[in-house]
């Protein structure tokens, strides 16, 4: 749905504070908001998606934030971190200044994550903690944005129980923030503007990047995979790829600004380019183009095994600035569980992909995601996940207990694996994760590695820390001037999840860029 189509069908949504407690607010969202619905959400590709490269903030909004400050609290994935950079960019363009003091901030935004129940609980706790601030300083604005805002039940809960919130907006209309803020300042009612359908791809949005060493580069929006446990296709919309020329221009600018590493972002980066109707262009082509740009390291996340092509493998195998680290979520090692998850691949096809990757990229580091305790998962099925882990030999994994998300197909399944069983399985899996991580780390002892120094260690300000191209954390002592630089470090000690080493020297960029 493009901007013109939206304007023709949209309605303003304002919920009066004095009536919120008695109403069901879902009816307010008939045009601008719909709850997650698999059948409706799968109706993709018919609405025209336009590319808007002329984004500008209307002059009437500039100066709105003069002598005002803002603070954004961010939960969730790298895409949320990227969105926060855009929100901060818009706020600064309006005249606001960033602050780290929540007690003095004039605008407080909570950028939310809906992927797991635990993340949502943290957000509601955070909103509740802000009630006293709103009471003490009624002129401040408190807003909720991000993926949770795309869920009807969440918006209803905020409207009913959290009257300290002034505005709610979603993932598709961040560029409308100036209008939302103005409405919030002028209205005594809560301002709710949540688009269920994605809009145009908006380029040239201002950004305030976190740091000047590493940068996020969004290459696409949305996801069309509809894994049965996942709310993301509903909260982020259909897959929409940015134009390659826009991405390449952004990466070139980051290289000119001196960034040492970029991460190409998308809910499923391997689907990049499938929706570009005028050209045949995929992630492999994009990586090939970016490999020619003078930026030392290029990563990408997140990958779906179903879309991982041999072309991509070949491009990564050529080396250069594309790092030999692939995060390849498997979720389960059992075919029956994979089928009810809607993952579209089998244990056998996943292992075949891993073999092709290892054959072409012998030095690759593979990491993964795994969900434990999916509905109907038996002990035997879980053990197949453990044996798959052995067979692949992942160097690390992010492991999770299954978390039911309302609106997903899995929410209709009986969650029949007892919590104590889930926790016991997770403990066994994590023991295996630690075992293989230790094996991978031990191979570095006595070796010299190149590390991108990112700053001081979280545990010791006198120690610097950074990551290798395979995403291994390295701690070492060196002059503070090395922060932001690529350095050589000899590894003296391998721990389970990190490495300790001795600084050797700075690495000149031309020694890294191929």
From Swiss-Prot:
Domain MTTase N-terminal as annotated: residue spans: 68-186
SUPFAM superfamilies the UniProt entry points to: Radical SAM enzymes
Reaction catalyzed: N(6)-dimethylallyladenosine(37) in tRNA + (sulfur carrier)-SH + AH2 + 2 S-adenosyl-L-methionine = 2-methylsulfanyl-N(6)-dimethylallyladenosine(37) in tRNA + (sulfur carrier)-H + 5'-deoxyadenosine + L-methionine + A + S-adenosyl-L-homocysteine + 2 H(+)
Gene that encodes it: miaB
Annotated [4Fe-4S] cluster 2 binding sites: 223, 227, 230
Origin species: Staphylococcus aureus (strain NCTC 8325 / PS 47)
Domain Radical SAM core: 209-440
Annotated keywords: 4Fe-4S, Cytoplasm, Iron, Iron-sulfur, Metal-binding, S-adenosyl-L-methionine, Transferase, tRNA processing
Record localization: Cytoplasm
Name of the protein in question: tRNA-2-methylthio-N(6)-dimethylallyladenosine synthase
Subunit structure: Monomer.
Physiological role: Catalyzes the methylthiolation of N6-(dimethylallyl)adenosine (i(6)A), leading to the formation of 2-methylthio-N6-(dimethylallyl)adenosine (ms(2)i(6)A) at position 37 in tRNAs that read codons beginning with uridine.
EC number: 2.8.4.3
Domain TRAM: 442-505
Single GO cellular component term: cytosol
GO BP terms in the entry: tRNA methylthiolation
Binding-site positions, [4Fe-4S] cluster 1: 77, 113, 147
Cofactor note as given: Binds 2 [4Fe-4S] clusters. One cluster is coordinated with 3 cysteines and an exchangeable S-adenosyl-L-methionine.
Entry cofactors: [4Fe-4S] cluster
InterPro entries xrefs: Elp3/MiaA/NifB-like_rSAM, Methylthiotransferase, Methylthiotransferase_CS, Methylthiotransferase_N, Methylthiotransferase_N_sf, MiaB_methiolase, rSAM, rSAM_horseshoe
